[in-house]
Amino acid sequence: MPQQSMQASLIDPIAEIERSNCKIAHLRLGLVFTSDNNERALQDSGLYSPDSEDSSVDIAGRRFHSGTLNGSSIVYVKTGSPSVNMATTLQILLVRFNIHGVIYFGNAGSLDKKTMVPGDVSVPQAVAFTGVWNWKKFGSEKGKLVFGDFNYPENGENLLGTVEYEKIKMFSPSEAPKEVFWLPITKSWYNAATEALKDMKLRKCYSDECLPGKPKVVFGSKSSTSDFYVRNKAYGDFLNDNFDAKTADTASASVALTSLSNEKLFVVFQGVSNVAGETSSNSRVSYLASYNAFLAATKFINSIPTPRLACE
């Protein structure tokens, strides 16, 4: 558990940060990610500057950092995984800080290597929880995922039966709860990202490791989120064929659901670090994927205005 910062010893640390200097009491952008690799990409870039020597605060074991990213005011936090950690940490961020919108960057696996390969960055248009299952009783009505279809060497009956993919219930302040499957990225921010990143050049090499091709930004795909990593090619193909999902991760849908429930703008940047069913990329390629996703997130952040509060 991280050591407590000076602010964390105050009665109301967040309020104190916001009151102590009116110049920082404005709406910030929330930057969230899950891993040490993601945080290292941010720190290695040299683009982040803390507001002061003591501009971090610990809440519920998470450390929140206030500063600027290439001149844009942000609060960033490493959430950890799986999805419940992302949702919990993001909710704390939105409740305790003045956040205008949420930017997530992180790693994902490609489910379609014809579309995306390691080093590419995906900016999906919609994400979904594909790990919420209704596991059917053997011999009952068939669900979408039929385990017998994957018997080897021949298809047939399987005691695991079938699985139906469930919708999730979304709550919001202004609407009655509703069941949804696909969670759309904020349209205005998605459009802004496509404009800001349309000619973006990504990094091809890190240390002595270079990608075999020129990495690219891919717009408009769909993404799958669950609490398990998709390394199996057959299941990756199933998600691609049945849901048109091109990437899979453990966090994006949590970002979407929490942001939508709080009526906050949000966008997702995924650095592709592997292809389902193929040999896992080495640590340098994985870091390069994180770094490219971070670069895309930063360029987007610097392209949008941040509203100010009255005290400015």
Swiss-Prot record:
A molecular function (GO) term: catalytic activity
Known tissue expression: Bark.
Keywords attached to this entry: Glycoprotein, Signal, Storage protein
Residues annotated as glycosylated: N70
Pfam families on file: PNP_UDP_1
Superkingdom of origin: Eukaryota
GO biological process, alphabetically ordered: nucleoside metabolic process
Expression induction or repression: By photoperiod. Short days stimulate accumulation, while long days inhibit.
Family to which this protein belongs: To wound-inducible poplar endochitinases.
Protein's name in the database: Bark storage protein A
Species of the source: Populus deltoides (Eastern poplar)
